[in-house]
A protein has these predicted regions:
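N-terminal Sec-pathway targeting helices
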Residues: 1-14, 24-26
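Sec-dependent signal peptide cleavage junction
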Residues: 20-41
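Functionally critical loop-and-helix segments that line ligand-binding/catalytic clefts
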Residues: 42, 48-87, 221-290
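Alpha-helical scaffold elements lining the catalytic groove of polysaccharide deacetylases
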Residues: 147-163, 177-192
Length: 290
């Protein structure tokens, strides 16, 4: 006769089998997971490494404000009195400002806009007020010396007065013949300015004057051309020239909120990349290099 197995023994037996299966599955899962983690940590020799390099430009540059790119650019001097300007309002309507610092050696006596030494009476206020409102500022000097030595002296005075404000560009305003070889005089001014430390130097000149007096623009890094069309306060047409230029002064009769009198209005050449040229002329650098 067969011996009966007690139910309690069977229960213990089945519980043991089930526990063994569960434990085996758990161990297998853990081993598989460990193999996966090990595979992840082993670099694939065929996978290119990612390298992180610091951008040199990010150390020096601040990006431009894109809202400013399409706005008019104005050039002003002591003839635009600070007391008549609402800088808060005008700053909302311009993309950049070019401020006269030196009026040239033609000054015979002091006037409302200029000291006898040629320095503009309002340049400091204009620069400071616009810079406080985050409007980029460039500067210009009217070139009117009678020989190369005097040209270099004016360049020194211009740079000494303007450089503390770290302008984005230095412009030479060339409108009249004041010495026999005007091209040599302009180059003497430019070269002296560069030797003093100015890196961005442009020239403002009419195409007719440039051709008539053989003024070379090759060593300048930017060209600013005045042509007014009807001079009615609006942009009429691009300058009639094959010369590549950066900035166009298109009217002397412009009107903008923030100033109740006429202003010179300028725009970036329509044939150029607007943002690229704006960045070239008006980008402020973190290290404020001139």
């Amino acid at each position: 006769m067969r011996k009966r197995i007690k139910p309690a023994v069977l229960l213990v037996f089945f519980i043991g089998i089930i526990s063994f299966l569960v434990l085996s599955r758990t161990i297998a899962d853990l081993q598989a997971r460990e193999r996966q983690e090990t595979t992840k940590t082993i670099p694939n020799p065929n996978t290119p490494r990612k390298t992180t390099t610091a951008s040199s430009s990010s150390k020096k540059e601040e990006d431009i404000n894109p809202e400013l790119v399409g706005r008019p650019i104005i050039d002003i001097s002591g003839w635009q009195l600070p007391s008549e300007i609402d800088y808060d309002v005008l700053s909302q309507n311009v993309g950049g400002v070019i401020v006269r610092v030196h009026s040239g050696a033609q000054a015979k006596k002091e006037n409302a806009a200029t000291y006898l030494n040629g320095l503009d009476k309002s340049f400091k206020t204009h620069i400071q007020e616009f810079q406080k409102r985050n409007i980029p500022v460039a500067v210009y000097a009217y070139v009117a010396a009678k020989d190369k030595k005097e040209m270099e002296k004016e360049a020194e005075e211009f740079y000494k007065a303007a450089s503390p404000y770290k302008p984005t560009y230095y412009w030479l305003d060339v409108e009249e013949k004041t010495m026999k070889d005007m091209n040599a005089g302009v180059e003497a001014f430019r070269a002296k300015l560069q030797a003093l430390g100015a890196k961005n130097i442009g020239i403002y000149i009419g195409t007719y004057f440039m051709e008539e007096h053989s003024i070379s623009t090759d060593k300048f890094t930017a060209l600013w051309i005045p042509t007014y069309g009807f001079d009615d306060g609006y942009y009429n047409a691009a300058p009639d020239t094959n010369t590549e230029y950066d900035l166009h002064q298109y009217t002397s009769q412009g009107q903008l909120n923030g100033f109740s009198h006429y202003l010179d209005l300028n725009q970036i050449a329509p044939t150029q990349d607007q943002e690229a040229i704006y960045r070239k002329l008006f980008k402020v650098q973190k290290d404020n290099s001139s």
